[in-house]
Amino acid sequence: MPAKLNSPSRYHGIYNAPHRAFLRSVGLTDEEIGKPLVAIATAWSEAGPCNFHTLALARVAKEGTKEAGLSPLAFPTMVVNDNIGMGSEGMRYSLVSRDLIADMVEAQFNAHAFDGLVGIGGCDKTTPGILMAMARLNVPSIYIYGGSAEPGYFMGKRLTIEDVHEAIGAYLAKRITENELYEIEKRAHPTLGTCSGLFTANTMGSMSEALGMALPGSASPTATSSRRVMYVKETGKALGSLIENGIKSREILTFEAFENAITTLMAMGGSTNAVLHLLAIAYEAGVKLTLDDFNRISKRTPYIASMKPGGDYVMADLDEVGGVPVVLKKLLDAGLLHGDVLTVTGKTMKQNLEQYKYPNVPHSHIVRDVKNPIKPRGGIVILKGSLAPEGAVIKVAATNVVKFEGKAKVYNSEDDAFKGVQSGEVSEGEVVIIRYEGPKGAPGMPEMLRVTAAIMGAGLNNVALVTDGRFSGATRGPMVGHVAPEAMVGGPIAIVEDGDTIVIDVESERLDLKLSEEEIKNRLKRWSPPSPRYKSGLLAKYASLVSQASMGAVTRPA
């Protein structure tokens, strides 16, 4: 048994007899009470396919931990399904749920004196929420992603949930029929699991591997794959070794590990939401990570993985050629990763990648060599300038636009912007501004997928969008999000007016409002914040505690 465990102080000895009595009530024997007690934290919900199956995976993880000589007890965390909340008040709870999940795992773990932690997640905020808790707790921990859905098909075209959102815009623009929309809806997401493209959920699953917090190859098998079950069981077994050797999460979650994750994010062209989440996980791990680190790494990292929405393939395709380790190995061989970082296997990243069993199949159609990239620069760029002094984010993997200058069309909410696009208010060449949708303003920094999909679906190919809100990982096109400071706290986006000129310049890493400094200052002096949308309840509480997007939108003590 390891030298130092939490559970003996709670469950061993005469004075802990009442605690042991309760463990006996749930079926634990004397022998099991004497073993390390571990938590299986499971983000489970029937409200959507992403986490519908994770309760079953928890049972498999328990089997693995038992084989490793541990005594597991499982508990659920909440889940907010992003796709179901999209375009409604429900989306304001999405990012909120990330920090709630972290808090829930912390509370359960510490309240019951567990010795180690297996985390199981699926939908977008569950992976970062659980990883934040692991970083905060600094205990032996290992993560396993629940897996993505298989892609759908209609009329010979491969579908993801992105196609349903864009089909709405296409229908409203009379480009497809209502029946075609219905058929796309029925076929786009045919199985349990998360969205099949490299949207936020699959991006964060990939990040769990790149950080060293998940077993190599565990992110890519689909939710319905027998290999998914195998990885879950092996994850449970691996926790035993972490506890035995006293390896805690912060020994893995180092600055170098975060550099590896950012490098992988840039190479794969993953979701912009990963910027927020990696900043948040680093904050909980006590690692100083900034937006400048993302740009520094983006400049040196080529974009090499052709994954939807920026490319052609889905997670199941990547799995067939070897999964995330294929990307990691190319980056390591090019000298772009820290190979000496510790991982949950107890081995280094380099050792894991050398020992991994790669399928003997061609993969260059999905993952290119570093010397023959899709684009020479990473898939995400941080912009700063007079419109975003603290930063903003654009996914260049999903657009070929490197410079865009246009007149502003300003909306004070996502709903107003969606109605504007629907009614034909937005014209080619314009920059749609959506503000008061930031962490404090919305609150909850909702995703603008309904608007971006409407723009794309309507065939408006020369329209940009700038917002202090977020974007779905399924978003494509010249879309800039995470503008900081946000409008609600008096960021310059608050004083943009219809007709102002906005300049997006990726090569110069700039996002500017073409006004003099004096005019910007004068407008800010005249500006006053609107009344908060919520004065009580969870969202009001969240708005009072949340930081800006440039800091990961983490909640901190007031």
UniProtKB/Swiss-Prot annotation:
Pfam families: ILV_EDD_C (PF24877), ILVD_EDD_N (PF00920)
Pathway entry: Amino-acid biosynthesis; L-isoleucine biosynthesis; L-isoleucine from 2-oxobutanoate: step 3/4; Amino-acid biosynthesis; L-valine biosynthesis; L-valine from pyruvate: step 3/4
PROSITE patterns listed in its UniProt record: ILVD_EDD_1 (PS00886), ILVD_EDD_2 (PS00887)
UniProt-listed Enzyme Commission number(s): 4.2.1.9
Principal EC category: lyase
Cofactor note: Binds 1 [2Fe-2S] cluster per subunit. This cluster acts as a Lewis acid cofactor.
Sequence positions that bind Mg(2+): D82, D124, K125, E447
Keyword line: 2Fe-2S, Amino-acid biosynthesis, Branched-chain amino acid biosynthesis, Iron, Iron-sulfur, Lyase, Magnesium, Metal-binding
Binding site for [2Fe-2S] cluster: C50, C123, C195
Cofactors that this protein relies on: [2Fe-2S] cluster; Mg(2+)
Residue list for modification N6-carboxylysine: K125
Single Gene Ontology MF annotation: dihydroxy-acid dehydratase activity
Catalyzed reaction equations: (2R)-2,3-dihydroxy-3-methylbutanoate = 3-methyl-2-oxobutanoate + H2O; (2R,3R)-2,3-dihydroxy-3-methylpentanoate = (S)-3-methyl-2-oxopentanoate + H2O
A GO BP entry: branched-chain amino acid biosynthetic process
Active site: S472
Family named by the database record: Belongs to the IlvD/Edd family.
Quaternary assembly: Homodimer.
Function: Functions in the biosynthesis of branched-chain amino acids. Catalyzes the dehydration of (2R,3R)-2,3-dihydroxy-3-methylpentanoate (2,3-dihydroxy-3-methylvalerate) into 2-oxo-3-methylpentanoate (2-oxo-3-methylvalerate) and of (2R)-2,3-dihydroxy-3-methylbutanoate (2,3-dihydroxyisovalerate) into 2-oxo-3-methylbutanoate (2-oxoisovalerate), the penultimate precursor to L-isoleucine and L-valine, respectively.
Protein name: Dihydroxy-acid dehydratase
